[in-house]
Every structure is written in structure tokens, then in C-alpha cells.
């Protein structure tokens, strides 16, 4: 009877925006980080860095999650006092707020989705460019424009009045997002490493090397792309 007279649907709807925000941030960051680390591990197989990163990934993948979360809370929240331990905001800052926290969560979700879509289209637009320097420059320019657009978004119009509240929520999200990302990226990294090591044995990789293609191009355009399918499939099943 703690939440009476609210119905279960009302309670779920009340907490859904903050759940979706955390879910979106963790999945985007962990998938990108895991895939990036995984392809580097496969490419540098046999090296000392590959050994240590693989051991770290296996530890993250097999660690007991409740214990690890408590250790993160103890170290970053209690011992170092860098990050807040409980709740998702400071109640005293929201006492006179003209809107509910869910409004800020919805705005932050929209912002993350828009920025992610823009970066995806920048990547798709530049991926077939032959010149590595041109590709890097265009992606860097796209990133700068995205950052400028984000700054304008949060400093103009209706979002300006909500910026401080969004920063409060974002500050409280650092620790949970980081903690879940550390344990979530490992599965993607290990799967990417395994599938890419199989791909590197294929004949077309040997052909690409014989044609004199750069190591980066062989890794990113030939090996990593073909290793991506099972990784994306696993990622989709994880979301579902």
C-alpha cells in the first residue's frame, strides 16, 4: 500500500523515462567500446596488450555484478567522494522546479537519440572515402559541428531553463552508466575478438594484403565489417 492509490501502470510510466535513458546510454557506450576493443584485440593477437585486455574483459564478463556494483559505490562514492551514491538527483535542487524530472529525462533521451543518429549518418557518409586523411578530417568536422549544435541546443529556447536540472541528472548517471558499461562491454569485446580472428583466416584477407592495402583498411573495411554480423545479432538479442 506504499504507492496507493497509484496503479501499477502509473508507477511504470513514472519510472520509464529514467530507465530508458540509462538503458540507451549503457547500450550505446558498451557496444561501441566493446566492438572497438574487440577488433583491436583480434588484430594484435599474441601481444602483451592483447593478453592483459583479454584477462580484464574476462574478469568483467564473469564478475559477480552485485559485488562489483557495491565496490564501485564504495570506491567512487564513499572512499573518493567523487560521485553521488544514491538517488538520481539532489532533491533540494528540485524543490522549486517548475517541471517534473520525467520531462528532463524525455528531453535528454531525445537529445541522445538525435546526436547518435547524426554521428551515424556522418560515419555512413564518410565510410567509403578512400583517403584516410580526408575521412578523418570530415569526421572531425562533423564531430565539432555536433558539439556546437549540442551547445546551442542546451543554451537556447526552452532547453536553457532545463540545462541545470539535466546536468544534475547527468552527474548522478555517471556512476551507474560507467559501472554497467564495464560489465557489459566485455561480452561484445570477446565476441568481436573471436569472430574477427576467424575472419582473418579467410582468403580475401590474404588477397587484400597481397594487393598492398594498408593494415588499417584491411582491419576496418574487410575484417571488422564481416565480423560485425554476429556481434550485432547478439546485441539485438541482448536488447530484446
Residue ranges and their predicted role:
Residues 1-35:
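An internal, D/E-rich "acidic patch" concept
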Residues 24-28, 32, 67, 71, ...:
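Hydrophobic alpha-helical segments of membrane proteins
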Residues 26-57, 69-74, 125-130:
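Transmembrane-helix boundary motif in ABC transporter permease subunits
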Residues 33-36, 178, 182-196, 200:
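Membrane-embedded alpha-helices of multi-pass transport/permease systems
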Residues 56-63, 67-183:
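Membrane-water interface segments at transmembrane-helix boundaries in multipass membrane proteins
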Residues 197, 216-240:
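Transmembrane alpha-helices
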Amino acid at each position: 500500500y506504499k504507492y496507493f492509490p497509484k496503479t501499477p501502470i502509473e508507477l511504470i510510466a513514472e519510472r520509464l523515462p529514467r530507465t530508458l535513458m540509462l538503458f540507451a546510454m549503457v547500450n550505446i557506450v558498451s557496444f561501441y567500446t566493446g566492438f572497438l576493443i574487440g577488433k583491436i584485440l583480434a588484430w594484435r593477437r599474441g601481444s602483451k596488450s592483447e593478453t592483459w585486455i583479454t584477462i580484464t574483459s574476462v574478469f568483467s564478463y564473469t564478475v559477480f555484478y552485485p559485488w562489483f556494483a557495491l565496490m564501485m559505490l564504495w570506491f567512487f562514492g564513499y572512499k573518493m567522494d567523487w560521485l553521488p551514491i544514491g538517488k538520481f538527483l539532489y532533491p533540494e535542487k528540485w524543490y522549486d522546479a517548475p517541471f517534473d524530472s520525467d520531462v528532463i529525462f524525455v528531453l535528454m533521451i531525445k537529445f541522445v537519440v538525435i546526436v547518435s543518429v547524426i554521428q551515424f549518418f556522418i560515419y555512413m557518409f564518410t565510410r567509403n572515402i578512400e583517403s584516410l586523411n580526408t575521412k578523418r578530417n570530415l569526421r572531425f568536422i562533423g564531430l565539432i559541428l555536433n558539439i556546437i549544435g549540442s551547445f546551442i541546443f542546451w543554451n537556447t529556447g526552452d532547453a536553457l531553463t532545463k540545462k541545470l536540472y539535466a546536468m544534475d541528472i547527468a552527474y548522478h548517471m555517471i556512476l551507474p552508466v560507467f559501472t554497467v558499461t564495464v560489465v557489459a562491454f566485455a561480452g561484445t569485446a570477446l565476441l568481436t575478438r573471436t569472430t574477427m580472428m576467424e575472419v582473418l583466416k579467410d582468403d580475401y584477407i590474404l588477397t587484400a594484403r597481397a594487393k598492398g592495402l594498408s593494415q588499417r583498411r584491411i582491419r576496418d573495411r574487410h575484417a571488422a565489417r564481416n565480423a560485425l554480423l554476429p556481434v550485432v545479432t547478439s546485441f539485438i538479442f541482448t536488447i530484446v
